[in-house]
Each structure stands twice: as structure tokens, then as C-alpha cells.
């Protein structure tokens, strides 16, 4: 086989259908759009959720709730992830970022209690769940809110 003999796999490339190029093509004259009507026009067609003029579902249902513009999103760290550190390590947000436990600090770090903690660590974070705090202290470590 030579370079000039290379061909795409059969069926992997389909020729583009050019419409409006004569009736012999099967897609001439009206270009597959039928005669007149909304869908034959440029920009024709209805928007998503259109129900033929009937009040659509999204307008029949009431509005609910709001978006809290002051919402803080914390980077989540589970206890399991803290086992990678040596005994007696002071775990800070900077260390977690450095070691790749979290990819972004966001509004801070929140430690959650998923998994087992076997190491004695000093953990500094912005928030702790009750179960995480309990588990860290049970393992002989300390927690510090920053």
C-alpha cells in the first residue's frame, strides 16, 4: 500500500446533499420544504416548547424560588482523601491545592465525613461537617476553622 492509495473506510464519509439544484436531484425546486407555509419560509418554524398557540406548560406553571446571589460554593474534601498525608501533617487549603486533592479553592474548603481517617492530622479549613470533625478528633487530630 502506498500513500496515494489510502482511502477512507467505506461508509465513513457521506457526500453533502446540495438542495435546489434541479428536479433530477430529488431535492430541487422547493428544496425538500414542500409548498408555502411557515416551515417553507426563511427563519420559519416554531420555537422550542411551542404548543400551537395554547399557553405552553412553562407559562402555565407558577414561578418558584430565587437564586441566592450571595451563595458560597466550597471545595469539598472527604476524610478518605486526607489519608494520603503523613501522621502529624498540618493540612491547609494551600497544601490540598498543591497535592491536587482540590483543583480550585472556590470560596474555601469544606471537609466532609465520607470514608475512614487513620492518620493523626491538624486540619485547617473554612468549614467542617459534624461527622468529619468527630472523626478527625477521634483519630487524635485537631480541627481549626480559618
Swiss-Prot record:
Gene Ontology terms: biological process: translation
Domain of life: Bacteria
GO molecular function, one term: structural constituent of ribosome
Region ranges (Disordered): 1-51
One Pfam family cited in the UniProt record for this chain: Ribosomal_L27A
Keywords for this protein: Ribonucleoprotein, Ribosomal protein, RNA-binding, rRNA-binding
InterPro entries xrefs: Ribosomal_uL15, Ribosomal_uL15/eL18, Ribosomal_uL15/eL18_sf, Ribosomal_uL15_bac-type, Ribosomal_uL15_CS
Cellular component aspect of the GO annotation: cytosolic large ribosomal subunit
Gly residues bias locations: 21-31, 42-51
Family classification: Belongs to the universal ribosomal protein uL15 family.
Function: Binds to the 23S rRNA.
Record note on quaternary structure: Part of the 50S ribosomal subunit.
The protein's name in its UniProt record: Large ribosomal subunit protein uL15
Organism: Anoxybacillus flavithermus (strain DSM 21510 / WK1)
Amino acid at each position: 500500500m502506498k500513500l496515494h492509495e489510502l482511502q477512507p473506510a467505506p461508509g465513513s464519509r457521506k457526500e453533502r446533499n446540495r438542495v435546489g439544484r434541479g428536479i433530477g436531484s430529488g431535492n430541487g425546486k422547493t428544496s425538500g420544504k414542500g409548498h408555502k407555509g411557515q416551515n417553507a419560509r426563511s427563519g420559519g418554524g416554531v420555537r422550542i416548547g411551542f404548543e400551537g398557540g395554547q399557553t405552553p406548560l412553562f407559562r402555565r406553571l407558577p414561578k418558584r424560588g430565587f437564586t441566592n446571589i450571595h451563595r458560597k460554593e466550597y471545595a469539598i474534601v472527604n476524610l478518605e482523601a486526607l489519608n494520603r498525608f503523613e501522621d502529624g501533617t498540618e493540612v491547609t487549603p494551600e497544601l490540598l491545592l498543591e497535592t491536587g486533592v482540590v483543583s480550585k479553592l472556590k470560596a474555601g474548603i469544606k471537609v466532609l465525613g465520607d470514608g475512614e481517617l487513620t492518620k493523626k492530622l491538624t486540619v485547617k479549613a473554612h468549614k467542617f461537617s459534624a461527622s468529619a470533625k468527630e472523626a478527625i478528633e477521634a483519630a487524635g487530630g485537631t480541627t481549626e476553622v480559618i
